[in-house]
């Protein structure tokens, strides 16, 4: 299975399954990227952890990061899903993902 191409006026969903964009220079760079996507005609949808700084080196607890990823992946309102930053601690969320639900959802 492959995701559909992102169409003009499509919606890009952003999540923070590891470190997000709560601090500089990541916050400014992310906001510049969001502005560029809007200028190109895309809509954006941000997960609740994109600007969170609740964990140590991770945007929130592994459970909350997994819930964000799960909800955004299953949300039909966004067409593609991107991480807003980080990745080093994403492996901590894996036990909390419902892989059967991910398999059933359209690919992103």
Give, region by region, the residue ranges found by the protein language model.
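Short, acidic/small-residue loops that bind anionic groups at enzyme active sites
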Residues: 97-108
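Long, contiguous hydrophobic alpha-helical segments, chiefly transmembrane helices and signal peptides
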Residues: 15, 88-90, 108
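Short linear functional motifs in flexible/disordered or boundary regions
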Residues: 24-26, 81, 93, 105
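ATP/NTP phosphate-donor binding region
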Residues: 1-77
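Long, hydrophobic/aromatic-enriched structural stretches that serve as scaffold segments
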Residues: 66-67, 71-97
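Short, glycine/charged-enriched secondary-structure capping and boundary segments
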Residues: 27-29, 95-98
């Amino acid at each position: 299975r492959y995701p559909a191409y992102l169409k003009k006026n499509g919606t890009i969903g952003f999540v923070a399954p590891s470190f997000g964009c709560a601090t500089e220079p990541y916050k400014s760079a992310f906001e510049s990227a969001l502005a560029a996507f809007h200028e190109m005609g895309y809509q954006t949808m941000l997960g609740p952890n994109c600007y969170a700084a609740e964990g140590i080196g991770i945007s929130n607890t592994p459970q909350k990061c997994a819930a964000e990823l799960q909800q955004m992946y299953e949300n039909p309102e966004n067409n593609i899903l991107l991480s807003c930053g980080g990745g080093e601690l994403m492996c901590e969320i894996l036990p909390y993902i419902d892989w059967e639900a991910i398999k059933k959802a359209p690919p992103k």
